[in-house]
Amino acid sequence: MFMLPKYQTFWVFIMISSLIPLLALLISRLLAPVSKGPEKMTSYESGIEPMGDAWIQFQIRYYSFALVFVIFDVETVFLYPWAMSFYELGIFAFIEALIFVFILIIGLVYAWRKRALEWS
């Protein structure tokens, strides 16, 4: 059974939700004055001029922790629509979801063994 008509509303929503921000950026680009001055190149911190160098280096553990978070956050984005249409899709989709979750568990075990989840 081909389910394309069920997803037409979804694709229209995706196109419109992609078009609106692009139009907003285009209109602001056309209407905003272009000024390249020293004020535009400064960093803004709550209306106060920054003291010292505004650029700092973060430790690598912040990046690895954020990367693991993003991976598992995207996992929930993929699993939510599957859970909402669980009864319609049948056993084949259930097995596919189990394989997907199993691959993610392997990734979690790998990150755990590499100590990517430890803060110290």
UniProtKB/Swiss-Prot annotation:
GO MF entries: NADH dehydrogenase (ubiquinone) activity; quinone binding
Keyword Nucleotide-binding appears in the UniProt entry: no
Reactions catalysed according to its record: a plastoquinone + NADH + (n+1) H(+)(in) = a plastoquinol + NAD(+) + n H(+)(out); a plastoquinone + NADPH + (n+1) H(+)(in) = a plastoquinol + NADP(+) + n H(+)(out)
Membrane topology of the entry: Multi-pass membrane protein
Membrane-traversing stretches: 7-27, 64-84, 89-109
Domain of life: Eukaryota
The keyword Translocase is annotated on this UniProt entry: yes
Pfam families: Oxidored_q4
Classification via HAMAP family: NDH1_NuoA (MF_01394)
Subunit annotation: NDH is composed of at least 16 different subunits, 5 of which are encoded in the nucleus.
Function of the molecule: NDH shuttles electrons from NAD(P)H:plastoquinone, via FMN and iron-sulfur (Fe-S) centers, to quinones in the photosynthetic chain and possibly in a chloroplast respiratory chain. The immediate electron acceptor for the enzyme in this species is believed to be plastoquinone. Couples the redox reaction to proton translocation, and thus conserves the redox energy in a proton gradient.
Family as reported in the entry's similarity comment: Belongs to the complex I subunit 3 family.
Entry protein name: NAD(P)H-quinone oxidoreductase subunit 3, chloroplastic
Source organism per UniProt: Psilotum nudum
